[in-house]
């Protein structure tokens, strides 16, 4: 489509980058309106998530009491929208509830200062006090029998506990998706608690839901980080790229409408406006299902599902078939003699169309890569359109994309080859060594958590078809590295990490990949107690055993950052043999106390 057609389209429809599908009338009582739209069950679930994400230390019972009070008040407003306080904004109503909590300052410290502010500053203040790494004990899943007994006694309370425990550990979890995962959890329990062998039915199914939910959480946190640091424009660019890949037959106007509304929905959830977010997400799903003809041929299966499953399905729907007759992208964006004129007349829209056209042709690229290419294209036009002969200057821009494309492709090949050779645990260890060398000042628990999460990319992505690997690997790594940055921001210790985390979100992964050994680091002193183990390690679950061994590995690298792969392998093999021998010994304690010091000596000698 020629650029002039885009301009006509904009002229007729207003700004294609500013209009969405939501067309809501103002309501006398916002809370009554949301209660009516969402229904009591979803309303109560969302209010519980909201309170749990703001007040992460409160017990379930405290939150359940607040939820019931808010629900009762909403019902009053449904009955009479002109009743006292029903016209107040949701922020005001929720904020007043939070500020009325007994002992707020004793339990939450500076968060209590937010209560001296007026809206919207008060809500912004609450958001700033959300803790991405709250000091809560790990969530332990009860035994199958105990879980089924609790579930059968009171399914509503059981699922309420699930929402509360997940939400307070993940204060930016996408609330409508958390309702979806709770629904999945409920269905699994309903099915498995009727089985004779509850444990073997529940464990794999609940593990699967947990894994998907954790990935959903880190992805949503990255979206909120993008919104918080770079504003709506950056998020909308992400949405345009992602939607264009998924719906390559939709026209630019349709994609920008969807991107505008997706941006609104995510902004609401990231800002804690969970009732609006869930309501608008349902509206967006409804719009997509009513307009399948102009969006995608792949939506019908999703649209046949009930609300929560429908919205989840639409967010993960497979890519539509790419149009067969797409012209070369160079025609409008390189060869056209009026590129600079078109760019100057409407920069954001011109760049938006470039991103749309490039993305719909490349479902095999990651969104991060597509945004880096758009950024390169923008920088080229900024430079070239100021020169005497712009076409000669920007004529090679598409060829200049090649190094940017090759870098992540090489990353995927190298890492997937390594994963196939080592398996997940060995691959995690390789990443742990790599990242400890890059940022040895970062705390060992943070490095181990990051390496374990980054290492899962192999299992998650390397078994996929070739054309799906790159988007899977890079977009997953970007989300995990965002968490590394969030944790590092609280207690910055590494200039390397600060440098990568301070720049653009889409440049972070390449920045981390390019880091080398930190030459400024003064190695840690070798401490024997760091490598001293006791017989209790023998009875730990496999995951916790791995974490203990990976903690020792990170400490070894901090002691000897330039240790060779062979040296580290020798030490870790010796360590594994030591554990195997002592855990099989008749007198484990004696074995650990006598062989442990010998292991420490051998470690020091191997790394000398």
Curated annotation (Swiss-Prot):
Residue numbers binding Ca(2+) 2: 37, 279
Modification Phosphothreonine, positions: 444, 446, 570
Binding-site residues for Zn(2+), renumbered to this chain: 91, 271, 273
Reported modifications of this chain: Phosphorylated by FAM20C in the extracellular medium.
GO molecular function: DNA binding; enterobactin binding; exogenous protein binding; fatty acid binding; identical protein binding; metal ion binding; oxygen binding; protein-folding chaperone binding
GO cellular component: a single term: extracellular exosome
Main location: secreted
Phosphoserine modification, residue list: 29, 82, 89, 297, 443, 513
Swiss-Prot/TrEMBL GO biological process terms: cellular response to calcium ion starvation; cellular response to starvation; negative regulation of mitochondrial depolarization
Domain of life from the UniProt record: Eukaryota
Tissue-specific expression: Plasma. Expressed in the granular cells within the cerebellum.
Residue ranges constituting the Albumin domain according to the UniProt record: 19-211, 212-403, 404-601
Compartments where located: Secreted
Residue numbers binding Cu cation: 27
Propiece residues: 19-24
Pfam families hit by this protein: Serum_albumin
N6-methyllysine: residues bearing it: 558
Keyword terms of this UniProt record: Calcium, Cleavage on pair of basic residues, Copper, Disulfide bond, Lipid-binding, Metal-binding, Methylation, Phosphoprotein, Repeat, Secreted, Signal, Zinc
Residues modified as N6-succinyllysine: 229, 460, 543, 588
CDD domains: ALBUMIN
Keyword Secreted among UniProt keywords: yes
Quaternary structure annotation from Swiss-Prot or TrEMBL: Part of a complex composed of complement component C3, CLCA1/CLCA3, A2ML1/OH and ALB/serum albumin. Interacts with FCGRT; this interaction regulates ALB homeostasis. Interacts with TASOR. In plasma, occurs in a covalently-linked complex with chromophore-bound alpha-1-microglobulin; this interaction does not prevent fatty acid binding to ALB.
Function: Binds water, Ca(2+), Na(+), K(+), fatty acids, hormones, bilirubin and drugs. Its main function is the regulation of the colloidal osmotic pressure of blood. Major zinc transporter in plasma, typically binds about 80% of all plasma zinc. Major calcium and magnesium transporter in plasma, binds approximately 45% of circulating calcium and magnesium in plasma. Potentially has more than two calcium-binding sites and might additionally bind calcium in a non-specific manner.
Name of the featured protein: Albumin
Organism encoding this protein: Mus musculus
């Amino acid at each position: 489509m020629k650029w002039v057609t885009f301009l006509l389209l904009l002229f007729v429809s207003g700004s294609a980058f500013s209009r969405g599908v939501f067309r809501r009338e103002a309501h006398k009582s916002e809370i009554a309106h949301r209660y009516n739209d969402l229904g009591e069950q979803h309303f109560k679930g969302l209010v519980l998530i909201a309170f749990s994400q703001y007040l992460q230390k409160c017990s379930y019972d405290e939150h359940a009491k607040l939820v019931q009070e808010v629900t009762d008040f909403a019902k009053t407003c449904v009955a009479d929208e002109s009743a006292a306080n029903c016209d107040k904004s949701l922020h005001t109503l929720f904020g007043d509830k939070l500020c009325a909590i007994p002992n707020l300052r004793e339990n939450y410290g500076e968060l209590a200062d937010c209560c001296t502010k007026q809206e919207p500053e008060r809500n912004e203040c609450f958001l700033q006090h959300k803790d991405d790494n709250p000091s809560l004990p790990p969530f332990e899943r009860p035994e199958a029998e105990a879980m089924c007994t609790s579930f059968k006694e009171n399914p509503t309370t059981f699922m309420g506990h699930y929402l509360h425990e997940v939400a307070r550990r993940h204060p930016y979890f996408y609330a409508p998706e958390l309702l979806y995962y709770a629904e999945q959890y409920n269905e699994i329990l309903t099915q498995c608690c009727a089985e004779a062998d509850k444990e073997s039915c529940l464990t794999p199914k609940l593990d699967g839901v947990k894994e998907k939910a954790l990935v959903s959480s880190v992805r949503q946190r990255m979206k909120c980080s993008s919104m918080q640091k770079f504003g709506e424009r950056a998020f909308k660019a992400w949405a345009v790229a992602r939607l264009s890949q998924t719906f390559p037959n939709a026209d630019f106007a349709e994609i920008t409408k969807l991107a505008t509304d997706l941006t609104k929905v995510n902004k609401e959830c990231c800002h804690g406006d969970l009732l609006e977010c869930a309501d608008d997400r349902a509206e967006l799903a409804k719009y997509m299902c009513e307009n399948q003809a102009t969006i995608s041929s792949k939506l019908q299966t999703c649209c046949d599902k009930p609300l929560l499953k429908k919205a989840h399905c639409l967010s993960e729907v497979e890519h539509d078939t790419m149009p067969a007759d797409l012209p070369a992208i160079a025609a409008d964006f390189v060869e056209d003699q009026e590129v600079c004129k078109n760019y100057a007349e409407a920069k954001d829209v011109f760049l938006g169309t470039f991103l749309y056209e490039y993305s719909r042709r490349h479902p095999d690229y990651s969104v991060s890569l597509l945004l880096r290419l758009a950024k390169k294209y923008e920088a080229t036009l900024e430079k070239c359109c100021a020169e005497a002969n712009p076409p000669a200057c920007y004529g090679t821009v598409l060829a200049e994309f090649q190094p940017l494309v090759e870098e992540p492709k090489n990353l995927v090949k190298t890492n997937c080859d390594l994963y196939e050779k080592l398996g997940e645990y060995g691959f995690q260890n390789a990443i742990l060594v790599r990242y400890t060398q890059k940022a040895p000042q970062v705390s060992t628990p943070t490095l181990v958590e990051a390496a374990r999460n980054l290492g899962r990319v192999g299992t998650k992505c390397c078994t996929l078809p070739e054309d799906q690997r790159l988007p899977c690997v890079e977009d997953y790594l970007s989300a995990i590295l965002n968490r590394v940055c969030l944790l590092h921001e609280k207690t910055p210790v590494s200039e390397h990490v600060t440098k990568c985390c301070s720049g653009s979100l889409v440049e972070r992964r390449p920045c981390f990949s390019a880091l080398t050994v930190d030459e400024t680091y003064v190695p840690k002193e070798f401490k024997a107690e760091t490598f001293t183990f006791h017989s209790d390690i023998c009875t730990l679950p496999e995951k916790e055993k791995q974490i203990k061994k990976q903690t020792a590995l990170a400490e070894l690298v901090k002691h000897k950052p330039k240790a060779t792969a062979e040296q580290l392998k020798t030490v870790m093999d010796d360590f594994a043999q030591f554990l195997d021998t002592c855990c099989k010994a008749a007198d484990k304690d004696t074995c650990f106390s006598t062989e442990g010091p010998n292991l420490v000596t051998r470690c020091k000698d191997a790394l000398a």
